[in-house]
């Protein structure tokens, strides 16, 4: 009887053998991660620790994310994204959707030992825990598992490999939970320059370094920006980041605003073109990296900000703070602020079509709600979001609040205070409900699910269960769409060694450096003193930085140091500490910084606290300011008039001016070259005549400035902002209107206006100038 048994066994095995033969997938393992190649289909990645198994259907491999043993629509990568997202949203509990609506607070990796972003590992600080830097903190496990958070804001990382390993640990952790929804990790911009870093052709770095947004704008070349987006997206994905909390496309219509440096300047058309290029670069995948419609494994969701434009804060004050909560429109120019969105971010050239997400600003767009006449922050304003963004401009992507908008206000001048402008009297749950009813999908910086589920119950009482369930699923579909399109449901895992080779690789470093060279504006070249001769002797004065506070309100220490890497300078020039021995002086300064327009000491001493934002170094007294502010009022203030008329302010870095004037005197007529790192427009009259040449940069390595000064590269950038003749014109200009200042004219007769710049031949007149520099008619 043995032979028939063998025959039966063999026959029983035949179907399985045939099925294996028909399989279109293969698998390889790298540690705990298995990578699956589907021939003619989407490739997969899953963690052996998550409990997820592979289903074979029609010969293809699929991940059984909810572990029910069958292929659900949302697990089927052959189906359209919207069909998958709707299927998954319908399966999610209210608590799970509420978690998807959260966006974590800032997460350094590893977690900090103290401060607002602190974390622990087995209840110990990292240094005492024995944990790896790539391990999940206790707090991360808590908000991922208990609060169902799937959108994590990653800040500092120790290295690309650690970032990749942390990503894999986080993805494996959530893959094993519930429906297996992956994390959509995000980042604020992280490609800025380190001024003292040295660029070596052919060498890699920690991450490619590019000029700041204003510097990208100063190229007046959208192709440079598109290339930045394309490269940055590859580096982001190698770090496990699939959403960029950028670009910032607000038009910088008030020169005093603290966030001017993050914009593409004051011109709506230039900002729109740069926004389009940036997002096309970030979101578009091509060739084998494309999944569908331009989306794929090199795509990073771009969250364009800040709708409907945050650059019109009264007096230039910023709405991270209660003292800057109002955006005002004395020029009736609200609509022009929408152009970078409607003509740029929502009208892409690439196949992805429009920005994946939008972030409204903290501001109350004062008296702009023509429907409900509400003066509440944009995140709460149904007219601003539902009527304008959603209905008029047909935007159906994710809308995510800026960070901490639902929190309680604690003080007028704290960066970490809640920013519930205009709805301070509502409970936290009521604020969440109002945000949802305004058309917003997601809460930035909120880790706790309870207020969202409370908001759901408020809605059920008001509109019924069916209405609120549909409203939640609507947001869930939008949020899931961005996770599906970037391939995260199929493979959210990285190979750390590949990440190490990708991030900061030589060709990326070179592209960033070339962009830096294209971003430096030459404003002055008296008697064609430039380019300087290499090998001459230079004097570089040390820069004094007084103690102060940064934009986040954190204390910064006093410093006296060289503002540029002197070892780099020595590769171009001989160096001396004695001006008498020098052929040239090279001075590196920063644009004036007088703070944000609020003085806490003034408030404590019985004043209102409001002072002018000063764009010159020396003391400025605001004799020409408005006697009565356009907007005002806060629960923590007993007055509504926020005027600063007659009050004074001095730049914190007034010593920069002294450095120029002192050096000019010490050089006794020998050439003085001034390089300004600019964050805001400034009044040049204080020192222009003491400089033979002036450069402006918006965040570059000092080496790039030296390459321009010595003629290794020719300056080609143009001013993306006007430079005011004085503070009187700053007070006279309207917060909401671009190109409306009298501009400074230097001793060579050149006007420092939008679009001005010099090359070795003189004033630049080219196709960029023809396209963007027009006579502007005031609205």
Predicted regions and their residues:
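Bacterial Sec-dependent N-terminal signal peptides
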Residues: 1-24
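Glycoside hydrolase catalytic-domain context in secreted enzymes
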Residues: 21-779
């Amino acid at each position: 009887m043995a032979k028939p048994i063998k025959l039966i066994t063999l026959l029983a095995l035949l179907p399985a053998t045939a099925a294996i033969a028909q399989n279109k997938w293969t698998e390889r393992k790298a540690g705990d991660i298995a990578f699956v190649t589907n021939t003619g289909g989407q490739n997969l990645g899953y963690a052996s620790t998550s409990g997820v198994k592979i289903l074979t259907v029609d010969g293809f491999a699929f991940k059984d994310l909810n572990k029910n043993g069958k292929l659900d629509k949302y697990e089927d990568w052959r189906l359209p994204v919207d069909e998958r997202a709707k299927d998954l949203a319908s399966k999610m509990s209210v608590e799970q959707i509420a978690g998807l609506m959260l966006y974590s607070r800032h997460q350094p990796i590893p977690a900090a030992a103290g401060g607002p972003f602190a974390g622990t590992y087995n209840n110990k600080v990292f240094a005492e825990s024995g944990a790896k830097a790539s391990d999940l903190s206790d707090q991360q496990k808590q908000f991922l598992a208990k609060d169902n958070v799937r959108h994590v804001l990653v800040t500092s990382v120790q290295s690309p490999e650690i970032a990749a390993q942390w990503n894999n640990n986080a993805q494996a952790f959530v893959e094993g939970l519930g429906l297996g929804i992956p994390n959509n990790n995000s980042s604020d911009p992280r490609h800025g320059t380190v001024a003292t870093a040295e660029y070596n052709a052919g060498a890699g770095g920690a991450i490619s370094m590019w000029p700041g947004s204003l510097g990208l704008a100063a190229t007046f070349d959208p192709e440079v920006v598109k290339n930045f987006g394309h490269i940055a997206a590859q580096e982001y994905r190698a770090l496990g980041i699939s959403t960029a909390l950028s670009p910032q496309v607000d038009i910088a219509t008030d020169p005093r605003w603290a966030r001017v440096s993050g914009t593409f300047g004051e011109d709506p058309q230039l900002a729109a073109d740069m926004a389009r290029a940036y997002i096309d670069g970030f979101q578009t995948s091509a060739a084998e990296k494309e999944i569908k419609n331009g989306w794929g494994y090199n795509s990073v969701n771009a969250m364009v900000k800040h709708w409907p434009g945050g650059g019109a804060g009264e007096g230039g004050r910023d709405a991270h703070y209660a003292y800057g909560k109002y955006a005002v429109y004395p020029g009736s120019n609200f609509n022009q602020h929408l152009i970078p969105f409607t003509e740029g971010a929502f009208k892409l050239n690439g196949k992805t079509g429009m920005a994946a997400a939008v972030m409204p600003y903290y501001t109350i767009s004062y008296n702009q709600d023509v429907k409900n006449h509400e003066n509440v922050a944009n995140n709460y304003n149904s007219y601003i979001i539902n009527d304008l963004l959603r209905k008029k401009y047909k935007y159906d992507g994710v809308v995510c609040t800026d960070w901490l908008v639902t929190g309680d206000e604690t003080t007028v001048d704290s960066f970490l205070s809640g920013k519930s402008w205009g709805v301070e009297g509502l409970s936290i749950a009521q604020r969440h409900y109002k945000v949802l009813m305004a058309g917003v999908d997601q809460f930035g910086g909120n880790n706790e699910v309870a207020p969202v589920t409370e908001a759901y119950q408020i809605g059920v009482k008001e509109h019924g269960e069916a209405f609120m369930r549909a409203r939640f699923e609507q947001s869930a579909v939008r949020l899931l769409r961005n996770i599906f399109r970037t391939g995260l449901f199929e493979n959210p895992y990285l190979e750390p060694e590949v990440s190490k080779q990708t991030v900061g690789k030589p060709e990326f470093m070179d592209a960033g450096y070339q962009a830096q060279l294209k971003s430096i504006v030459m404003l002055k070249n008296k008697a064609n003193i430039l380019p300087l001769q290499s090998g001459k002797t230079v004097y570089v004065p040390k820069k004094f930085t007084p103690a102060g506070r940064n934009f986040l309100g954190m204390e910064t220490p006093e410093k006296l140091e060289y503002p540029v890497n002197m070892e780099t300078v020595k590769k171009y020039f001989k160096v001396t500490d004695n001006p008498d021995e020098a052929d040239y002086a090279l001075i590196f300064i920063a644009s004036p910084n007088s703070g944000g327009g609020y003085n806490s000491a003034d408030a404590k001493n019985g004043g209102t606290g409001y002072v002018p934002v000063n764009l010159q170094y020396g003391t400025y007294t605001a004799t020409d300011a408005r006697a009565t502010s356009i907007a005002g009022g806060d629960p923590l203030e007993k007055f509504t008039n926020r005027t600063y008329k007659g009050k004074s302010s001095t730049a914190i870095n007034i010593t920069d001016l002294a450095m120029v004037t002192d050096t000019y005197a010490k050089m006794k007529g020998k050439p003085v070259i001034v390089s300004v790192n600019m964050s805001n427009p400034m009044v040049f009259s204080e020192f222009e005549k003491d400089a033979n040449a002036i450069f402006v940069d918006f965040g570059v390595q000092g080496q790039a400035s030296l390459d321009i000064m010595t003629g290794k590269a020719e300056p080609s950038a143009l001013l993306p902002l006007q430079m005011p003749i004085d503070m009187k014109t700053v007070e006279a200009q309207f917060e909401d209107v671009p190109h409306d200042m009298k501009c400074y004219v230097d001793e060579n007769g050149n006007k420092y206006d939008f679009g001005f710049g010099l090359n070795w031949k003189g004033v630049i007149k080219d196709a960029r100038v023809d396209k963007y520099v027009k006579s502007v008619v005031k609205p």
